[in-house]
A protein has these predicted regions:
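Glycine-rich phosphate-binding "P-loop"
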Residues: 1-6, 88-99
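N-terminal amphipathic alpha-helix/helix-capping segment at the start of soluble metabolic enzymes
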Residues: 1-31
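Non-catalytic helical/linker scaffolds that mediate oligomerization, partner binding
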Residues: 2-5, 65-68, 75-83
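Surface-exposed amphipathic alpha-helices with a cationic face
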Residues: 10, 15-22, 42, 78-82, ...
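Hydrophobic faces of well-ordered beta-strands that scaffold small-molecule active sites
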Residues: 28-31, 49-51, 89-93, 121-123, ...
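Glycine-rich, proline-tolerant flexible connector loops at the mouths of alpha/beta enzymes
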Residues: 37-38, 44, 48-74, 93-100, ...
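Conserved anion-binding
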Residues: 86, 97-100, 104, 110-155
Length: 155
């Protein structure tokens, strides 16, 4: 997409987000599930695009986010990444893909990153997922922290 509203075309990275926070700058974030919307959101200068498990509701018409699969999230993640030049792209790991073991969490995280080329992942949960998140980070995968948020299990 030609031109960015903000005029800033530099790729947003996790390091850059930390710098923005330290300077007290506002950080913008919107959700996208597809190539075309991702181009529009990215072109508007949004800093972070979340490929949320809410695609289950918005794109597939499900009542909850629980039915969405890892492969469906990968599809949406790939579509969004292809449409983005500037924004940092975060992909949700869907419920049930990281809760049973740290090994499963890392395996699924690596799969999503290798196939989608996203910039970071997001897992929902609290203290019960800390060890899985630590292993994912140790594998070199950035995590967009949302500890304490458990929307998927409280629907």
């Amino acid at each position: 997409m030609a031109g960015y509203i903000s005029g800033d075309t530099r790729k947003v990275t996790t390091h850059r987000l930390v710098e923005m926070k330290q300077r007290g700058e506002k950080i913008s974030m919107l959700t996208s599930y597809d190539y075309t919307t991702a181009q529009i959101v990215d072109g508007a200068g949004i800093d972070v695009i979340l490929v949320g498990d809410s695609a289950s509701n918005v794109m597939a018409g499900n009542v909850t986010t629980l039915p969405i699969t890892l492969d469906q999230m990968i599809y949406h993640g790939k579509s969004v990444v292809r449409g983005v030049k500037r924004a940092l792209v975060v992909v949700d790991l869907p419920f049930g893909t990281y809760q049973t073991s740290e090994y499963e969490a890392v395996t699924n995280a690596i799969k999503v990153m290798k196939i989608t080329h996203a910039d970071a992942l997001k897992l929902e949960g609290g203290v019960e997922i800390i060890d899985a998140v630590k292993k994912i980070i140790a594998a070199g995968i950035p995590h967009h922290g949302t500890f304490g948020v458990n929307a998927a299990i409280y629907q």
